[in-house]
């Protein structure tokens, strides 16, 4: 009764091929040749490169992109301009007169002017006409006395008139200049120096200053020159504010 009630299953399109044979044939049909893969990849790359070239050409033709390409980033030297110290620091402090400081270094009034040496506030930044003859080393090292490392030449600072409105203050430079044949200058700070005339140093170590090598002097000069003009102006103004009350005593 159960066999009669169940309908007979009839499979159409039957085959005698086994599953192994069927899947083997399917794998053979689907597997492409390696040469075809390489050729298709090269074709795709060529198409992509052609599209990229067209896109790049369209981008270059845009006005905004053309303007940006003209403003390419400059090299470090081009952005900084001249690599020397004078170009980075600009003009020296104040207006230097003719032949103010002749030497290899940048002509600037160094730190630590002698007490009572130059007066007149900002007007003291104009040096005398004869100028100083140095070899590029720093004039003043930071104290209140003139302490040149290489020494000034004879008749270093010449001129009868003084810079600025106050002229030359106490202990100032005479006609013979610093350490010259005239009265010279009285260095009141630590380690002043004595010239051929009556100029003398009243501080400690006036004539016993150690001799430094050229490399050490150049290193000191480079360290000083690396400071900006604003920093030097601030130091000079602070020092002149300290020395003005003392000179007016």
From Swiss-Prot:
Keywords: Acetylation, Isopeptide bond, Methylation, Nucleus, Phosphoprotein, RNA-binding, Transcription, Transcription regulation, Ubl conjugation
Matches recorded under InterPro entries: CTOP_PRMT1, FoP_C
Sequence segments annotated as region (Disordered): 152-205
Gene Ontology biological process terms in this record: chromatin remodeling; in utero embryonic development; mRNA export from nucleus
GO cellular component, one term: transcription export complex
Residue positions of motif GAR motif: 195-204
Changes after translation: Asymmetrically methylated by PRMT1. Symmetrically methylated by PRMT5.
Residues with the Phosphoserine modification: 40, 49, 64
Site of covalent link Glycyl lysine isopeptide (Lys-Gly) (interchain with G-Cter in SUMO2): 70
UniProt biased composition (Gly residues): 158-196
Molecular-function GO terms, alphabetical: methyl-CpG binding; RNA binding
Keyword Magnesium assigned: no
UniProt main location, coarse: nucleus
Tissue-by-tissue expression: Broadly expressed with highest levels found in thymus, spleen, and lymph nodes. Expressed in an erythroid progenitor cell line derived from fetal liver.
Renumbered residue ranges of the record's region Interaction with PRMT1: 154-207
Subcellular location field: Nucleus; Nucleus, Nucleolus; Nucleus, Nucleoplasm; Nucleus speckle
Cystine bridges: none
Residues modified to N-acetylalanine: 2
Domain of life: Eukaryota
Phosphothreonine modification, residue list: 243
Keyword check for Nucleotide-binding: no
Function noted in UniProt: Plays an important role in the ligand-dependent activation of estrogen receptor target genes. May play a role in the silencing of fetal globin genes. Recruits the 5FMC complex to ZNF148, leading to desumoylation of ZNF148 and subsequent transactivation of ZNF148 target genes. Required for the tumorigenicity of glioblastoma cells. Binds to 5-hydroxymethylcytosine (5hmC) and associates with the methylosome complex containing PRMT1, PRMT5, MEP50 and ERH. The CHTOP-methylosome complex associated with 5hmC methylates H4R3 and transactivates genes involved in glioblastomagenesis.
Subunit description: Interacts with PRMT1 and PRMT5. Interacts with the 5FMC complex; the interaction is methylation-dependent. Interacts with FYTTD1, SET and PRC1 complex members CBX4, RNF2 and PHC2; the interactions are methylation-independent. Interacts with ZNF148. Interacts with WDR77 and ERH.
Identification of the protein by name: Chromatin target of PRMT1 protein
